[in-house]
Amino acid sequence: MFSSVMVALVSLAVAVSANPGLSLKVSGPEAVDGVNNLKVVTTITNTGDETLKLLNDPRGALHTMPTDTFAITNESGETPSFIGVKVKYVPSMAAKSTGENVFAVIAPGQSVNVEHDLSAAYNFTSSGAGTYALEALNVFNYIDPETNEPVEIWADAEAHTTAVSGKLAVVRATPTLTRPVTYNGCSSSEQSALAAAASAAQSYVAESLSYLQTHTAATPRYTTWFGSYISSRHSTVLQHYTDMNSNDFSSYSFDCTCTAAGTFAYVYPNRFGTVYLCGAFWKAPTTGTDSQAGTLVHESSHFTRNGGTKDYAYGQAAAKSLATMDPDKAVMNADNHEYFSENNPAQS
C-alpha cells in the first residue's frame, strides 16, 4: 500500500514538474544586395525541463522546404509575394511515421539551427526594396510520450530585421506541362498507383461538383467541412470545383523524387499541373480518408487557376474545427476540400 502511494506521488510530481518550452530566434545579415543572398537561420531552443520530440512540419522553422514559414513586413506594412510550395501534411499521421527526418529531438538547453533560403519562397518585387522584419511561424508539435499524439506548443519568438536592395526576385525555370502524362523519377508501380489515383480524383471532383450544383442549402456534408451556409461561400466552393473539374488529372505531370517521409505531396501554385509526391503518399490508400486520390484533390485546389486554396488547418479534426470557427477560411482551406470530396464517413 505504502509503495503504491509513493509510486503515485512520484508520478504526480514528475507530471507536475514537466514544463515544456521553446524559444525561436531568426538571425541573418543586417543587409543584403539581392534576395538571392537573403538566407536566414532559425534557432529552436528547448527552454523547458524535458526532452521534446518535435515534428519536422514542412510549414515550420525546422524544415527547409520553401513553404510560407515567415511573416515578412516592411516599414509600410507591405509583404512580399509568396512563390514557394503548398504541402499536404497530417501531423497525427506523421507522428506515427518511422521514416527518417520526421522528428527533431531536442534535450533541455539544446538548440537546432536550420538555414532557410528566402528567395526560394518570396518575391519582393511588389513590396520593393527596404527594411523588413522577418518572423518565423512559432507553432510546433511535440509528441506526448504518454499518448504518442502530437501536441501544439508555441515558442517565444524573436524576429530579425534586414535591409533588402538590389535584385528583388530570383527567376526560376518553370516546367512545361506536356501531354500525355509525364513522370519524373517514378517506378512502374508508382506510375500505376498514380494512374489509379488520378482517375479516382477525377471522379471525386466530378461528384463534388454535382453535389454542390444540386444542394444549394445547408446539408450535413456541406456544413461539416465548410461551416454555416451562406450563398457567397457556397459560390466560392462551387467555383473551385468547377475549375478543378476542367482539369484532366490524368494529364498532370508527376514527380516522385521527394523523400520527405512525413509529407504527402506539394505543388507550386503558379506551376499548374505539376505535383510532387512524397513518402506519406505511397502509404496512403487509393481512396478514403487522407487517400492518394484525395491528396490530388488537395493539391489541385492549391493551383492558382483552381482557386489557390491555403493550408490553414491540416487533418480532419482541425478542418472540422475550422469550418465551425471560421467558415470564411474553411472555404479556402485545401484539406476541407479534400475531406468534402472523400466524404468518409459518408454524409448526405
Curated annotation (Swiss-Prot):
Optimum pH is 9.5. Active from pH 6 to pH 10.5. Stable from pH 5 to pH 10. It catalyses: Preferential cleavage in proteins: -Xaa-|-Lys- (in which Xaa may be Pro). Residues 1-18 form the signal peptide. The active site is at E299. GO terms for molecular function: metal ion binding; metalloendopeptidase activity. PANTHER family: NEUTRAL PROTEASE 2-RELATED, PTHR37016. This is Peptidyl-Lys metalloendopeptidase. The gene is MEP.
